[in-house]
Amino acid sequence: MSFPKYKPSRLSPLPETLDPAEYNISPETRRAQAERLAIRAQLKREYLLQYNDPNRRGLIENPALLRWAYARTTNVYPNFRPTPKNSLMGALYGFGPLIFIYYIIKTERDRKEKLIQEGKLDRTFHLSY
């Protein structure tokens, strides 16, 4: 019984087990993969030694995570592009609430002042005019 030839779908990539590049790897690529695996194993061993240390004091700091967080917080401009949409949203979120609160307070005071001038508002505890 013969199986039909595998045809990759347009929506999903070729599985790694069927990829010929998975098995035809150059020695340099294999060496680089082995070095990365050794570094990963060494870092994992150091972390586990720190994690399982019974005399541990404080937190275990991950230097890669610290570098990543520092780069994200201090290096904003390579990751941010000012566009008209960003500018408009910044203005709306920055000035929109201030204008809205000003409008509410102003209309409420104007309405109250109009009722006071017409004499329709009962001001039992008023201290001014």
Curated annotation (Swiss-Prot):
Pfam families: NDUF_B4. One of its GO terms (cellular component) is respiratory chain complex I. Residues 1-26 are annotated as: Disordered. The modification N-acetylserine is found at residue 2. The chain crosses the membrane at residues 88-105. Keywords: Acetylation, Electron transport, Membrane, Mitochondrion, Mitochondrion inner membrane, Phosphoprotein, Respiratory chain, Transmembrane, Transmembrane helix, Transport. It is found in: Mitochondrion inner membrane. It is a single-pass membrane protein. The modification Phosphoserine is found at residue 26. Its main location: mitochondrion. Signal peptide: none annotated. Complex I is composed of 45 different subunits. Accessory subunit of the mitochondrial membrane respiratory chain NADH dehydrogenase (Complex I), that is believed not to be involved in catalysis. Complex I functions in the transfer of electrons from NADH to the respiratory chain. The immediate electron acceptor for the enzyme is believed to be ubiquinone. Belongs to the complex I NDUFB4 subunit family. This is NADH dehydrogenase [ubiquinone] 1 beta subcomplex subunit 4. The lineage of its organism: Eukaryota, Metazoa, Chordata, Craniata, Vertebrata.
